[in-house]
Amino acid sequence: TMSEGATSGTTEMKKPEVTAIDYEVVKNDLDHVILLAPDFVYGYYNRGNVSSLLKDYRAALADYDKAIELSPDFAEAYFNRGLTHIFLGNNKQGIADLSKAGELGIVSAYNIIKRFTDTRE
């Protein structure tokens, strides 16, 4: 019936699935942003996030390092670098970064540290 078609049409309007190819396009755009503005901290931070989504964790760490070098109080960069380190098994570095993120105002970082250390004991 007509109402069924209308209903199924609305369910198809949900958020389109993002593919790895889309992330590669974004990463290429961010490469250009960084070339044009090498001191733009969010270029590195966002490219680090995209690299993480693409499972290129080493590249993500390098970009978070650069973002932190450019902006030493960039809490979100410490937070994401900490999570990446923990994911890669660099627990000590990860916890140190999460602790710094907590000091800089991301209170949820402390909850992650607590959960992580509770399960590791």
Over which residues does each language-model region extend?
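Alpha-helical tetratricopeptide repeat
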Residues: T1-E121
